[in-house]
Amino acid sequence: MEQRKHWWNGKWGRIARKDVYLRVSGDQWYVEQRAGGAEGVSHFFEYDSEEAALDTVRALLASPGDWRELSVRPPSR
């Protein structure tokens, strides 16, 4: 699975932090909505197209916060 994009709501701390990830594996697209940082709770969404996944990302990023896109690390070899 390859991570394509990562957004963060600009808040620090386990309670306030939220992240949204866009990933792809083959023809399947995945969106992860995570609350609480690395050890937080995640909800996963699976889609057959990038556009459908991005629709969900846009809806999630409409929630309150100073959302910003974070750079994605290149895949390790």
Where is each model-derived feature located?
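A short, exposed loop/beta-hairpin motif centered on an aromatic-Gly-Thr core
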Residues: 35-52
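Short, surface-exposed linear segments at secondary-structure transitions and domain or protein termini
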Residues: 50-60
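Short, highly charged C-terminal tails/helix-capping segments
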Residues: 71-77
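Alpha-helical interaction segments
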Residues: 2, 18-20, 35-37, 56-58
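Intrinsically disordered, low-complexity regulatory regions of eukaryotic regulatory proteins
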Residues: 17, 30, 44-48, 64-67
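Short arginine-rich
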Residues: 59-71
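Short N-terminal "domain-start" leader segments
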Residues: 1-30, 77
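A structural detector for beta-sheet-dominated domains
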Residues: 23-25, 34, 48, 73
